[in-house]
Amino acid sequence: INYIIRLYYTRIKMMDTDKVRIQDDLYTYVNQEKLEELVIPDDQPSVGGFQTLAVDVEKIMINEFKEMCAKGVYPNHYLEKACTLFKIAKNAEKKEKDGIFPALKNLSILNELESFDTFSNMYKSLMFNQLPLPFQIMVETDMKNTKKHCVCIQGPSVILPDASYYKEEMAQQKEMLLGIWTNMAKMIMAKTNLSLEDQNKYIEDTLVFDEILGRLVKTSEEWSKYVEMYNPMKVSKVVTLLKTIRFKQILKELFGFIPETIIVTEPRYFKNFMNVFNEETFELYKHWSYVIGLIDSCSLLNEELRELGSMYYRAIAGIPSNTSIEKFAYQLSSNIYSEPVGLYYGEKYFGEEAKKDITEIVYQIIDTYKTRIQNNEILEEVTKEKAILKLSKIGVKMGYPDKVQDIYNKFVFNEEDSLYDVVHTLKEIKILENLEDVTKPTNPEKWAMPGHMVNACYDPFVNDITFPAAILQTPFYSIKQTRSENLGGIGAVIGHEISHAFDSNGAKCDEYGNINNWWTKEDKKRFNTKIKAMIKQFDGIELPWGKVNGKFIVSENMADNGGMAVTLEIMQKTPNASYEEYFENWAKVWCMKAKTEFLQLLLNLDVHAPNILRANITPRNFQEWYDTFHVQKTDKMYIAPGKRIVIW
């Protein structure tokens, strides 16, 4: 049974005259009626806020795709190709005819790995055929010189949601989840031409190899400290770590030359690589690659396998039903053709008046931030100058890009092929494009998110913010909402993203996005004290579905704090400002009803605090909250002045 989390804490049903007080629980006071009305769709783990907007955008765009397909009229050749992929993915009859065979044909490449010695010769082939590897090679922005690219190596993914699940204290959850996964794997492997004995052997070996990986790869908490991914090593040093393979040969075949330096994103994993991948574990690896590769392929095969392949994630996220074939087809197509789809959505559904108004808010926030930095008491003048310089250089990407990237012109596929082969072809083009980037300069004009995505981000290595058109709607933003409501919604979110330039990660990068210590020793010491206080404010909070890890979510909490601080200052200068509207809309944007399983998953995987804490804890740090609602010491949303945290 899935228990729905309706409220912050369990309470006896009250009379209508005995409602939750805003001074005790802002989130529930604002969202209680909405939470009672919301119904979580069978194919979703949650509803409300971001998710509701995303579903609405999806409905709009599915209808757009269907109309284009029906009329055979497309705004451009990119959307024509996207709709072609949509139709292929929706063709259940063709997928049934193709069955499991496209995946089995690709997996047969593993048969060519006759001995451990052949692995290095076949690495490129395995990579381009998208088979799971014991380590990945990719090209990324060089974090210390963001104008150029670098070569990175990274460990593989694990079966459990996160590497933290392999720790002793998670043994019970681990056993339960691996039981669900094993059940799924057995049903999928039964569709292959392997004997029952081999099927079981492959699955057993996969679990053994996965256990080796799980004890070495990074946890989500470790990944959240993204600056710590940057561990440059001379290629000669990496060769000694990977001495069980011919690493230089692999690099030469992929790039045509051997890079001098490699960025080792997971030092612990690669220091133990010889224990992970050697002659004794080679068969374990082959069987792991086969099983994981097949399961990862299921969504692109027939409907029965698409259903089977989703069992594990649906079980751990509390989702009863699989995504419909139509939704799946749209999601696949709009993901692969993300920029053209986002550009179309933005041009059609995001008005120039709104874009102008939002952009005005952005620059008002940046200017206010500069003033707050100048008046900040924890920074010395030299550090303030650097911080203000960084703010001056922040790029703003609002709505959607002017044009799509050139790679979409390379997306050519055979419409008669199976869905598996079509997607395989397109992903292969992306892999090649990534490798070819190694000698090219980075492109700061590239958008991190497409226009139809309900999200926003700050890119620390470009020093810019991206706000896709899809998030720029009610309750976050509307030209019809008051300025106070918009500041409590999209304004605080914009401030949040800008604040990432100065969070526990972003503060380590300069105005060009390069890792560069621009802080004085004393400033850094005072800043670290603030970080520790922010960790403490959230750490260990008990919710009905689990305990909060303050270290894991500290950067996002700092950003929420900064976003509220800067927009509350703007409120002071806003004509007819209503702090009630500001705080109530702040709570409204975080409204979410979710399955317990999903909420538990987020505690381990999501770098953001649970929505209820984002709504309820951040305001407590600001005097405006206390003045607006006359919050007293006896109220639950009261924090003593000495414990309130305002960083920027």
Task: Give a label for each model feature.
Residues 34-38, 160-161, 475:
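Short, solvent-exposed loop/turn elements at domain surfaces
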Residues 54, 206, 212, 235-248, ...:
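Intrinsically disordered, low-complexity linker/terminal regions across diverse proteins
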Residues 15-36, 170-190, 554, 561-566:
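Hydrophobic/aromatic-rich, well-ordered segments within soluble, folded domains that form packed cores
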Residues 1-13:
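Short, Lys/Arg-enriched N-terminal segments with co-localized hydrophobic residues
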Residues 18-22, 144-145, 458-461, 577:
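Extracellular/periplasmic catalytic domains that process cell-envelope and extracellular macromolecules
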Residues 21-25, 29-90:
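Active-site-surrounding "flap" and adjacent substrate/cofactor-binding loops of secreted or lumenal enzymes
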Residues 16-17, 139-140, 454-458:
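Short, surface-exposed beta-strand/loop micro-motifs that present aromatic residues
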Residues 60-360, 364, 401:
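Noncatalytic, helix-rich "gating/capping" subdomain that lines the substrate-entry/channel surface
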